[in-house]
Design a protein with these regions (language model features):
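Mature soluble binding/inhibitory domains
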Residues: 1-204
């Protein structure tokens, strides 16, 4: 049995240099058309190829083009999705985080599942941070909840009241530094909801 590849680490995300000006981060979902298709993301009128099929498991790739646009991509350990961030060197354009994948077409309707991965984010006190995440999903009840934890296991973020509709989901995102709760949304990717990805936002 092959050894499962390691996931990208918090340190690797920091080294990739993700940092965006406070208050300008937006978040979006994009999709790949089919299993094995090219993963692309639209940013400021540009189509970015974030497929990166030859990157090694457990790594995060950061690349900057001639215009100073930097793209940070993780998800090399996943078969049906990618996630990351894109920002300009001079911060003239808004920074964005993204989740891209092959949407699930055969959603489970019974049972439950637990997903573990990473959250990449930016905030007033947590520029270019990544956290470990865990989501508990009930396909029978069409609900999900989750947490975002530091390396030592301290809970920092909470995803609650998540509702599943088709292959998509949405709910309440709670951040201790935010004045009010925000929102999170996402999709399941791959056959039988093999993976999930999405974004969250809360105002400081």
């Amino acid at each position: 049995t092959p050894t499962p590849p390691t996931k990208p680490t918090v340190t690797e995300f920091k080294q990739a240099g993700y940092n965006s000006p406070k208050g300008t981060v937006s978040a979006n979902l994009a999709t790949a058309t089919s299993d094995g298709a090219k993963y692309t993301y639209q940013y400021e009128g540009k189509t970015l190829d974030i497929t990166l099929p030859n990157i090694k498991a457990g790594t995060v790739v950061s690349s900057t083009d001639g215009s100073g646009l930097t793209t940070v991509v993780g998800g090399s350990t996943y078969s049906y999705s990618r996630f990351g961030a894109v920002f300009s060197a001079n911060h003239e354009s808004p920074s964005e985080v993204f989740s891209v994948g092959v949407p699930t077409s055969n959603m489970p309707t019974t049972g439950s599942a637990q997903y573990k991965g990473l959250l990449l984010g930016d905030g007033m006190t947590s520029d270019r941070q990544a956290f470990h995440t865990q989501f508990d999903v009930s396909f029978a009840n069409k609900t999900l909840t989750g947490t975002g934890n530091t390396v030592d296991g301290t809970k920092v973020y909470e995803f609650r009241d998540g509702k599943i509709a088709g292959n998509a989901f949405a709910g309440v995102f709670a951040h201790p530094a935010a004045e009010t709760a925000g929102t999170f949304a996402g999709q399941f990717f791959g056959p039988n909801a093999a993976e999930l990805g999405g974004y969250a936002h809360a105002e400081d």
